[in-house]
Amino acid sequence: MENVTVLLSKKQSHFNKISPNSSISDALCRMSCQNTDYLIVVDDDEKFLGLLTDHDIATKTVFANKSLTTTKVKQMMNTRWPVADADNTVEDCMKLMSRYNVRYVPVFKNLSFLGVVSSDDILQEAVSHRSKIFDVEDKNVSVTYSY
């Protein structure tokens, strides 16, 4: 299976980032505007601090009746996250997601943040490979329907 960096190279190099001092309300606005369900939390030096997901907001803020305007991202972000190394395969990332029940895996190389692989990225990659296989087979197969 492909190396995880190959999958990252197919994604936009733009990261959906937010400051830990931003409000949850700001995070929701950013998620909505960028059409994403997670944000990468970084400090002023662009150092990766954690992830904030729509699930985090729902469970830790909304369902806990906390204020969206006064609660900060740093209070709700997830810092205990499984991470992948740049040398890991896509299959390794799938196993991490399954083991820890997460939809995203941050990828690092020598402590440098490279990006995030999502379960959607992996699914799109699998469908792409599957489509290539079926395209070749479909050209060699004739189908007859009988009623």
What is each stretch, according to the model?
Residues 1-147:
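Tandem CBS (Cystathionine beta-synthase) repeat/Bateman regulatory domains
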